[in-house]
Amino acid sequence: MLASGMLLENRLVERRSIIRLVEENFRDHFPSDQELPGLEFFPLGEDSWSYRCGPLWISVRRDLDGHFPGAYEVSLLLSESGKGYVLAPLPGRNGRVVHRIADFPVVVFPYVESATTPPAPPTQEQIDLLIARLGEVHAFEPPASRPVDVPTEDFRFPFENDLDKAVQAALNGDAAAGGPYAGLLAERVDRCQGFLAELREEATRVAGECAARWRGERPALTHGDPSLANVLFTKGVDIIDWGGAMWAPPERDWAALQRVFGTAPRSRPEFLRFYELRWHLAEIAEYATRFTGPHTGDADDDAMWERLTRYLPEPRGAS
């Protein structure tokens, strides 16, 4: 678990700023005569830096471009509608669910002990319960009195420009001075050009097919990444981290289940393939972008390079 997380604390967000946020918006979660406890940093999760402050779990999000506050707001509506398995964020005294520190989104949750321990593989019964609960989420309609701005699937690839820039920087040698993985990236991208081109061509074709078929269908409210990091398999099955919520075909969640657990409800193959391809290419774009910029070869870099090599494997016969 720790090997795949954000291992290093983000020093751009000062701890005193986080404590100030808690003091101003969440003081009522502590006894009035109690001094606020210090922050404890947890190296968990790839998309956030996480802290515990007594009964609170504080998530400083790093996904600035793909961040939609409405995704967290809709999880609060899900919880309030009786879906107790949705671990929703806590609204602050100012009424907001999403706060900002140093231009980073910050979301505060109740602290749950099981969210900080290494996950155990789920049983088939637990996976079946997860599927049933995701099905309930898919059918959810927010009340008209509380509209939320949740993005809708457009079958596009928002990372395409980043991927193009990273590939060109690697091939042109523009990133050679960025850090210890720049040269390795250039070699890997050069050998995998054909594989990457085929992957992108297939993704474009499948995206067009899915967009045409989905037109006119009722969208489902999807979580987007019901993985071991975001589902707590304890006595029940609780779903956390709703930052990627989106109106989309249900296969958006089923593809994630297939990728992580190797099983999913009966689904349309072309939609499953679209989400598989988009995930694959997004991972390549993210990690390639990291290694064409300044980096030091720290523990986070080591873990991300290992992941990149899984998504961009050496061609057969390469030496």
Curated annotation (Swiss-Prot):
Keywords: Antibiotic biosynthesis, Streptomycin biosynthesis. Pathway: Antibiotic biosynthesis; streptomycin biosynthesis. The keyword Cell membrane does not apply. GO terms for biological process: streptomycin biosynthetic process. It comes from the Bacteria. Pfam families: APH. This is Protein StrN. It comes from Streptomyces griseus. The lineage of its organism: Bacteria, Bacillati, Actinomycetota, Actinomycetes, Kitasatosporales.
